[in-house]
Amino acid sequence: VSSPLKRAQQTAEAFGLPVETDERFIELSYGVYEGVKHADVPSEVWNNWRKDFGYVPEGGESLAALDGRVRAACNDLIERASTSNVVVVSHVSPMKAAVAWALGVDIGISWNCHLDHASVCRIDFRDGRPVLYTFNETAQIT
């Protein structure tokens, strides 16, 4: 399963398996702040975004909206993951939301963790519940 963005699809294709896209795993929309360094985002906007998960930057998406769509996508994968391995290729913000889902915590945890590009987070299921097995694993890219 892949984000529809080209860079994610190219990574997914490297597994040599058919790639299914799911719009819900697309990166968070930063709106007018897309590509802008954190240091260049006005402090009021940055503080609102960090404190209020429902805050929507101009032209963007709230963390609450991201969290809702990723949790729904993860819930939809539970049945398939009970009978086979499922690989999701996505982006930092959706993967942090998936980790929050697996841990049963709110999206606010995303501000307290770091994911490297091309890192792996492994979520397995035990007794029908998600269990985070690895986080930010990078051994495959060294």
What is each residue range found by the language model?
Residues L17, L28-D40, E79-S84, W101-T142:
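Acidic, low-complexity terminal tails and accessory targeting/binding regions
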Residues V1-P4, N85-V89:
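Short glycine-rich phosphate-binding loop at a beta-alpha junction
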Residues V45-A65:
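Short glycine/proline- and acidic residue-enriched helix-loop micro-motifs
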Residues V1-W46:
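Phosphate-coordination/substrate-recognition cap region in phosphate-metabolizing enzymes
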